[in-house]
Amino acid sequence: MASITGLAKDLVPYPGPVPLRRRPTPARRPSETRIAPAVSPADPGLSELAQIEVDFEAGSNTLWAFMRPHGRPCQNPEMLADFSRLQDDIERVFGSGGPDLNYFVFGSRFPGVFSLGGDLNLFASKIRAGDEAALVGYGNACVDVLHRNMNALNLPIITIGLVQGDALGGGFEGLLSFDVIIAEKGTKFGFPEILFGLFPGMGAYSFLARRLGTIKAQEMILDGRTYTAEEMHELGIVHILAERGQGEAAVRAYIAGNRRRRNGQQAIYQAAREVDRISLDELRKIVAVWAAAAMNLTDRDLSIMERLVLAQDKLRGKAQAAQARTAPARALSASAR
């Protein structure tokens, strides 16, 4: 089984994707890795969000969204609220005779991290306060977002999870709700919750049991170790592997190569949801089990959880320092254009 020290050592950032460039979107070859500027509220009618950067690319009818977390790269309540608002916007704008939408791509701008999962600091504080209801409320907010995404917001679209950094705990769970997962080589996946006496309670078991079978799902949840993108690809969880730094290019290549069969592929994913249906009620019942289990954690368990929070804080500091070092070069490059 993985150790808490080993997991903390795994949380080391590597250079993230090419930074956002604020200029009009030209025609691009699939090999390029840039995306267009963040969308304004009037284009095509999506809200500006505090922790999610959004861009609609009309040429391919693709909506790109990237997390820009305030603080640790985890699913804080504000991030969840942003995601829910984005989902509302997508349904409103693209589900009511607006622009066509073929693809929804979701990734992260945090260097080396997709998401480290749930807000462990919040969990520890609510557990110490004996506030089980708050944990249930948080968990339900997570699975509400996940369930809507799993069903592609009831729109004829293909959802793509873009992994350019590590996806742990709830971050991994969230990815499992996408139709297609494209991951850069060397990124890590895993469920560390067992290290502090818990399990991933927001969808992991439901998704993995249907995809891998209950025995393999339990093994992956109970061993607490991290898996590479290559291992996830062998298991069929990751669909496409990309070279380091080429995740966005891989998404573009997938979209470009999928034009003629997109309609059929989208219908297949829709049919698959009917065959292996996961109800919101199932997800919420598991949240209740998770919250009840959380209330039984010991002081030692909570101390381990809080040590992970400290490791995440150090990771955030390293990422901020790296961004500060590269900011002058990015500004010079932008002015040159």
Model-identified regions with their sequence ranges:
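Catalytic cores of alpha/beta
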Residues: G170-G171
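Crotonase-fold acyl-CoA enzyme core
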Residues: L46-V54, W64-P69, N151-D166, S177-K188, ...
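C-terminal long alpha-helix characteristic of the crotonase
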Residues: H239-D301
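Conserved CoA-thioester-binding segment of acyl-CoA-metabolizing enzymes
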Residues: A2-V105
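A structural preference for short, pocket-lining loop segments at secondary-structure junctions
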Residues: S60, F83-D131, D144-I160, G186-T187, ...
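Hydrophobic/aromatic residues within transmembrane alpha-helices
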Residues: F106, D119, G174-L176, M232
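Long amphipathic alpha-helix in the N-terminal Rossmann-like dinucleotide-binding domain
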Residues: Y138-N140
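C-terminal non-catalytic accessory extensions
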Residues: S3-I4, R300-R337
